[in-house]
Amino acid sequence: MSVVATATTVETGHAHPSVNRPNLTSVGTIIWLSSELMFFAALFAMYFTLRSVTGPEHWKEMASHLNFPFSATNTTILVLSSLTCQLGVFAAERGDVKKLRMWFIVTFIMGAIFIGGQVFEYTELVKKDGLSLSSDPYGSVFYLTTGFHGLHVTGGLIAFLLVLGRTYAARRFTHEQATAAIVVSYYWHFVDVVWIGLFATIYMIK
């Protein structure tokens, strides 16, 4: 993941030059994401605890029901959406609202595809393999970890719509709108990194 700046180059309309310092909104978002990281750390701990209790052989048997190629493709889409999101941030820092809209719309579509793929995977697991939230400890932890992440991705999609809506509603692109785009990118990169960890843990570790 590329590191994003916390200050923008968009004109603010003040006569005096702006100081290149961290934006308080961005700093607050980073602190909040740190608390979210602890939440997902607890989910990871639950996963490995249940795995050790039920035994690795049972875990391996249940994991065989997962569609690895499909999930790997879905993961690739989410990872690439982080790149398009960052391109949108670069556009926001230049004050290029048209490019910001373009890249954020592309990111939104890719994120929506990821969520659609996750719903499809859930449907297949329930219908074909009978793996549900209450059928098995593995099913419980699988749906809880991936489901909570899916809710976070959905929250990110809503945030993209809000940022895009503000750019269309406002008469001019402002520093505050650029900051909002940067803050949303922090969140999106976060859910991307968390998913990479979940994917490696659930789909790759035997």
Swiss-Prot record:
Q: Which GO terms describe its molecular function?
A: cytochrome-c oxidase activity
**InterPro entries under this entry?**
Cyt_c/ubiquinol_Oxase_su3, Cyt_c_oxidase-like_su3, Cyt_c_oxidase_su3-like_sf, Cyt_c_oxidase_su3_a-hlx
Write down the membrane topology.
Multi-pass membrane protein
Per the UniProt entry, the Enzyme Commission number(s) are 7.1.1.9
GO terms classed as biological process: aerobic electron transport chain
Q: Which gene does this sequence derive from?
A: ctaE
The record's section on Pfam families has: COX3
EC top class named in words: translocase
Provide this UniProt record's keywords sorted from A to Z. Cell membrane, Membrane, Translocase, Transmembrane, Transmembrane helix
Q: Transmembrane stretches, by residue range? A: 30-50, 72-92, 102-122, 144-164, 182-202
The record's similarity note reads: Belongs to the cytochrome c oxidase subunit 3 family.
Catalysed reactions, semicolon-separated: 4 Fe(II)-[cytochrome c] + O2 + 8 H(+)(in) = 4 Fe(III)-[cytochrome c] + 2 H2O + 4 H(+)(out)
Cellular component terms (Gene Ontology): plasma membrane
Protein name, as recorded: Probable cytochrome c oxidase subunit 3
Q: Where in the cell is it found?
A: Cell membrane
Keyword Transferase in annotation: no
